[in-house]
Amino acid sequence: MAFSTQDSDEVLSEINVTPLVDVMLVLLVVFIVTAPLLTNSIPINLPKTESVAPPEQKDPLVVSIDGAGKLFVNKDEIQPELLESNLAAAKAKDAEVRVQLQADEGVNYGQVAKAMASIERAGITRLAVITAR
């Protein structure tokens, strides 16, 4: 009475992954055990210092030019000829005033250049031009 009808000469083409899993688990255990030892093993008591908190950063003035060419300072619409005096007053209050200039991409470059010139004439040297990524 024969139970098997297959040829006994066939080659087994499957890979035995059990030894691979065993090795990987051993490596995992080794890394888990040694990982805490990799931290600084020299105990050092660092000295405490008395430091002053850094000064608060003031919000910058935001000069905006919309698609229609209207000029805004911190969301308040102003006339272009008043920009320089408005910024000079802000410079008088805070010598370290920062200005962020943002303009719609459809705005004429000449308007942006005029706004930059007004910012420069007001004595403001910290200017950032805001763009989208």
Swiss-Prot record:
One of its GO terms (molecular function) is transmembrane transporter activity. The keyword Amino-acid biosynthesis does not apply. Residues 38-133 are periplasmic. Keywords: Cell inner membrane, Cell membrane, Membrane, Protein transport, Transmembrane, Transmembrane helix, Transport. It comes from the Bacteria. It is found in: Cell inner membrane. GO terms for biological process: protein transport. The chain crosses the membrane at residues 17-37. The accessory proteins ExbB and ExbD seem to form a complex with TonB. Involved in the TonB-dependent energy-dependent transport of various receptor-bound substrates. Belongs to the ExbD/TolR family. This is Biopolymer transport protein ExbD. It comes from Pseudomonas aeruginosa (strain ATCC 15692 / DSM 22644 / CIP 104116 / JCM 14847 / LMG 12228 / 1C / PRS 101 / PAO1). The gene is exbD.
